[in-house]
Amino acid sequence: MKGGKAMTISEVSRKYGLTADTIRYYERIGLIPAVHRNSSGNRDFTDEDCGWVEFIKCMRNAGLSIEALIDYVAMFQKGDSTIQARKNLLIEQRELLAEKIKNMTETLARLDVKIDRYDEKFVIKEQGLSGKNK
């Protein structure tokens, strides 16, 4: 392994906060290229394998679908002839993510207004109660 010793699936799982089952699933569907296995049949994750795990986790956290990631990995494996197509896929996914962020920001602002209204009503109610005790 370049740059260090190979990692077990448990170590990769802990490092990236993914279950071992999730990592196996990602490998099975081709999101992570086939991981080398040692003489005992256990996976030995290289730095490159870990790079794929980290990339997939980041993209999933950003909301990319499994299908979009499968397309991306398939294009990547075809080589440089797919560079523009990969870039286009990432641009498209970025636009979808930007729209989600915009929608979530708007929702957050609405929630803040709603919470402020509750705070205002609570303060008015407290003021009314304190006025009754005088």
Predicted features by range, described:
Residues 1-6, 78-134:
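C-terminal regulatory/oligomerization modules of transcriptional regulators
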Residues 1-71:
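Basic helix-turn-helix/winged-helix DNA-binding cores
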Residues 56-57, 73, 94, 98:
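Amphipathic alpha-helical segments within well-ordered protein domains
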Residues 69-80:
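Short, charged, low-complexity amphipathic alpha-helix
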